[in-house]
Amino acid sequence: MGPKVRIMRKEENKAIVSIQAWWRGTLVRRTLLHAALRAWIIQCWWKQKLVLLMENRRRVALDAFARQEWAVVKLQSWVRMWCIRLRYLRLLHAVRIIQVYWRWHSCHTRGFIQGHYDLKENQLNLQLEISLGSQACRVQQCIPLPIKE
């Protein structure tokens, strides 16, 4: 083997090494690209999961807040209702006392009207008792009702 052949072999080896380096570099770059794509896919999936988790946490917190607000409003309405009912009962008691005294006074000074009625299919039965001091008058009447057919 002469020097020419050695030089050609060196150049061939350089070309072979250069092609192998290019091919290995291509394989490494492809592998790195696939790894980067897979990492990117995993990151996107994880970000979506985090968004869902945060949304669920936000919804749970909002539901808890809404329930708490509803309970507060309900409690406030019950307290207001209780206060108004107490006031109403006090006023009702006062009205009943006034009515008792007024009825007693009215009955003893002017007289009173007492009676009841009975409503049947097509007639009204009235029974009234009117008292004016020592005089009393009783009225009983049956009134036919006009019925449109």
Curated annotation (Swiss-Prot):
Keyword list (alphabetical) reads: Repeat
The reply on keyword RNA-binding is no
- Could you name the domain of life of the organism this protein comes from? Eukaryota
Keyword Acetylation listed: no
GO MF term list: calmodulin binding
Return the InterPro entries for the record. Answer: IQ_motif_EF-hand-BS, IQCF
- Put simply, this protein is called IQ domain-containing protein F5
Organism of origin is: Bos taurus (Bovine)
Organism lineage string:
Eukaryota, Metazoa, Chordata, Craniata, Vertebrata
